[in-house]
């Protein structure tokens, strides 16, 4: 019921159009997190293949949600909670993910090029085959994260707790 109310509210406040591929298009939308809080936000929502390019979802509770193949490039997701969410193949290129929780989330094959993951919680996250080219992981926690096959070209690991046990606390 809460998910229905959330989507009803969103459909009443924004014009949501469908792309040719059937994905919802909420590009450039600023969501009122106060309203999302009243509706228990979007815990467990199915938002696969949705277009959230440059959307503002800062502080949103999206734990357990399905964002498979979602487009979130340039989005502001600072302080959001994606704990246990499925984000397989999602695109976060250039997104602000500062202090975002991805604890135990499935991030297999995601694009995180040039994303800001400063202070992010990536403990036990599956980042296998993820593209972290030029991503900033300063102060992030990657304890027990899976980075098998991940692309780490130019990734910043300053003061980061890595899965291989290094905290990089001496970097400047």
Model-identified regions with their sequence ranges:
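Positively charged n-region of N-terminal signal peptides that target proteins for export
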Residues: 1-4
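Bacterial N-terminal signal peptides
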Residues: 7-13
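N-terminal signal peptide c-region/cleavage motif recognized by signal peptidases
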Residues: 15-17
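Tandem repeat scaffolds
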Residues: 21-172
């Amino acid at each position: 019921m809460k998910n229905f109310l959330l989507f009803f509210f969103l459909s009443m406040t924004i014009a949501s159009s469908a792309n040719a591929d059937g994905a919802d298009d909420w590009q450039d939308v600023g969501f009122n997190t106060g309203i999302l809080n009243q509706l228990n936000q979007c815990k467990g929502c199915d938002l696969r293949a949705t277009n959230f390019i440059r959307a503002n979802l800062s502080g949103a509770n999206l734990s357990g949600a399905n964002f498979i193949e979602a487009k979130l490039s340039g989005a502001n997701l600072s302080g959001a909670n994606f704990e246990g969410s499925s984000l397989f193949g999602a695109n976060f290129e250039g997104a602000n993910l500062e202090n975002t929780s991805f604890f135990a989330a499935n991030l297999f094959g995601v694009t995180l090029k040039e994303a800001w993951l400063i202070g992010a919680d990536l403990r036990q996250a599956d980042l296998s085959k993820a593209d972290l080219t030029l991503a900033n992981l300063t102060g992030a926690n990657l304890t027990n994260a899976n980075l098998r096959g991940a692309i780490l070209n130019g990734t910043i690991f300053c003061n980061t707790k890595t899965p291989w046990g290094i905290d990089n606390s001496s970097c400047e």
